Swiss-Prot record:
Belongs to the ferritin family. Oligomer of 24 subunits. There are two types of subunits: L (light) chain and H (heavy) chain. The major chain can be light or heavy, depending on the species and tissue type. The functional molecule forms a roughly spherical shell with a diameter of 12 nm and contains a central cavity into which the insoluble mineral iron core is deposited. Interacts with NCOA4; NCOA4 promotes targeting of the iron-binding ferritin complex to autolysosomes following starvation or iron depletion. The modification N-acetylmethionine is found at M1. InterPro entries: Ferritin, Ferritin-like, Ferritin-like_diiron, Ferritin-like_SF, Ferritin_CS, Ferritin_DPS_dom. GO terms for cellular component: autophagosome; cytoplasm; cytoplasmic vesicle; lysosome. It holds the Pfam family Ferritin. The gene is FTH1. It catalyses: 4 Fe(2+) + O2 + 4 H(+) = 4 Fe(3+) + 2 H2O. Fe cation 1 binds at E28, E63, H66. This is Ferritin heavy chain. Its EC number is 1.16.3.1.
Length: 182
């Protein structure tokens, strides 16, 4: 058994920020888990919307990378990583593309709200490094993700989803399929 030594690099890093980073890591991993569930739902033979599956798998990987980036920050700042149980997705059956996109939009808004609270904490604790880190790597990306998902929800509704299965098929093929090509 090794004894943990106090950090030699910790400077201007409040314990509340350290704890909040650990909570954010958990939330990012939860988001990754939800997107992974969505991806493999759309990959099922009775759903067969391969571009929805690819889209959500990409989102899952992105959320995991966000968690890893926060873990790296925690180590760089002299904090300690304390992983917690990852909450399972609220559902296993995502019903249709519109419902999944609506759930994803809600999820991203929750992640964004948590990041904004973390930024406020960093500001209150006079931690410009953490503020800059969040602004550089997370906040703008969240706004873009929320806008993209909002657009997807709008377009699916405009096309007649979920009542029209053809709408989902065309959205999968043309909208999400185009994302894959670029």
């Amino acid at each position: 058994m090794t004894t943990a030594f106090p950090s030699q690099v910790r400077q201007n890093y409040h314990q509340d920020s350290e704890a909040a980073i650990n909570r954010q890591i958990n939330l990012e991993l939860h988001a990754s888990y939800v997107y992974l569930s969505m991806s493999f739902y759309f990959d099922r033979d009775d759903v067969a919307l391969k571009n929805f599956a690819k889209y959500f798998l990409h989102q899952s990987h992105e959320e995991r990378e966000h968690a890893e980036k926060l873990m790296k920050l925690q180590n760089q700042r002299g904090g300690r990583i304390f992983l917690q149980d990852i909450k399972k997705p609220d559902q296993d059956d995502w019903e249709n593309g519109l419902k999944a996109m609506e759930c994803a939009l809600h999820l991203e808004k929750n992640v964004n709200e948590s990041l904004l609270e973390l930024h406020k904490l960093a500001t209150d604790k006079n931690d410009p490094h953490l503020c800059d880190f969040l602004e550089t790597h997370y906040l703008n990306e969240q706004v873009k993700a929320i806008k993209e998902l909002g657009d997807h929800v709008t377009n699916l509704r405009r096309m007649g989803a979920p009542e029209s299965g053809m709408a989902e098929y065309l959205f999968d093929k043309h909208t999400l399929g185009e994302c894959d090509e670029s």
